[in-house]
């Protein structure tokens, strides 16, 4: 079908091209999986909802393979996501280039964000390197097409309509869980 950032399904199903910024996001819908005899094998799951591609740990290998330009997905994303992810990749690319004699940036200027970029802190459906090292499991998020967020804790106690979390992070008013 495709993978995050390169889809043809939207155009085929709705005449809206995801590759032109008008994705109808059919991959985020629920589907039933039916076998050849018509028996439903899986019902109402997000069977086409792939995780977000993240090869930031492989930037050096990609540069060594001859990649000279990186496309960073950002369609339908907010400015906070773009700022965070682009800054993250910029730091990774600069670090990789600095350790390779004979390589240099093709542009001038510097970017110095006033925060530590971390894609896991932005909207994410989970991450995958897809098939960078061959076929692997875990490229899809069958349970939800939404941001999976980060682990905040386990429910330690339930008291009527209230519950208590035990975990590694402090929560603040307005945090969504």
In which residue ranges do the predicted regions lie?
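Surface-exposed amphipathic alpha-helical tracts and adjacent flexible/coil segments at the periphery
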Residues: 1-177
């Amino acid at each position: 079908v495709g993978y995050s950032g390169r889809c043809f399904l939207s155009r085929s199903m709705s005449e809206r091209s995801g590759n032109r910024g008008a994705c109808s996001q059919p991959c985020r819908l629920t589907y039933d999986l039916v076998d050849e005899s018509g028996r439903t094998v899986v019902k109402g799951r997000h069977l086409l909802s792939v995780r977000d591609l993240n090869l930031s740990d492989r930037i050096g290998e990609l540069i060594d393979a001859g990649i000279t330009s990186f496309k960073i997905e950002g369609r339908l994303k907010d400015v906070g996501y773009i700022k965070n992810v682009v800054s993250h990749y910029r730091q990774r690319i600069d670090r990789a280039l600095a350790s390779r004699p004979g390589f240099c940036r093709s542009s001038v200027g510097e970017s110095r964000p006033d925060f530590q970029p971390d894609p896991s802190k932005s909207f994410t459906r989970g991450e995958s390197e897809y098939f960078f090292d061959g076929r692997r499991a875990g490229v899809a998020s069958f349970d939800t097409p939404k941001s999976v967020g980060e682990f905040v804790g386990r429910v330690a106690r339930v008291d009527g309509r209230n519950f208590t979390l035990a975990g590694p992070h402090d929560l603040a008013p307005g945090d969504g869980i």
